[in-house]
């Protein structure tokens, strides 16, 4: 004889209390404990399971938030209240009904119900701390691991001139004078060519490229790389530049020697901009690495590989800016805007300063090849 099916009803109290219980609301069962629910009530009863409804307002729960199953609305309300340390007042008797329809009518009673149902203020603070730690981990990880800015900074510091005293360049009008600005700049560039190769070797992945490609990249970008360096070194100098040899060349001296126009461009488009934004050495190193990894350099065996390296520097620099200067969202773009000026000035400097004659009778490719094949000269 079949056992008659028993109908079970779910007892619910008042709307306020309906969402206040943390006990599971059992669905009706048929034979052998198997759920037997009319089709039209399946959706309603599945939502009545505690973990599927918001303990605060009865809306659909999106999961456990701050210790309590709740909807996104109540989760966000509680988080905002705690993070901004907000206080509310009730216009009635502090017993307002909080349900899906009326949850926004009284913030005081809604917040009190959040606390009564077990939401934890400390869980909000812990979430913020975890997010901060995750952000720091991402900065030091995903975007940065292929092209660590720490290594780029190390490269900058390793080749930094160790000059202790700086000498004011003589303002002699004679172009043949040993203290002529053009001669001084050329001599400084001559010296810096050696350290430039050492710097490039320390940039992540540069030494992994074919030797011929290394030579091509340095030959294509070395004038811009040197100009970027002495421009940044000159941030603290008024109306002049500071060379790696320790000489300070004043703009008056440059004008007397006939290179005033390009000198002024260096001061206004590079030095002053770097000074105004307080560009740090990590950012300088990244900009120089971007110049170094130029996929448009003629003769490269694999331009796409060089382009991929440049994109890694972009990503690392952007992550660094967001982490180090979170209050300056446009800083990364502002840094990149210095590159066109650097390129233009670099081309002009080649016309004025005859850089390709700096190393005497040795062809620059031979010189670079010998330097790249040699072990690190700077420790």
UniProtKB/Swiss-Prot annotation:
GO molecular function: DNA-binding transcription factor activity; nuclear receptor activity; nuclear steroid receptor activity; retinoic acid-responsive element binding; zinc ion binding
Region (AF-2): 364-375
Ranges where the record places region Nuclear localization signal: 79-84
Matches recorded under CDD domains: NR_DBD_RXR, NR_LBD_RXR_like
Taxonomy, superkingdom: Eukaryota
Region of interest (Required for nuclear export), residue spans: 265-285
Protein family per UniProt: Belongs to the nuclear hormone receptor family. NR2 subfamily.
Protein name: Retinoic acid receptor RXR-alpha-B
Species per Swiss-Prot/TrEMBL record: Danio rerio
Annotated gene: rxrab
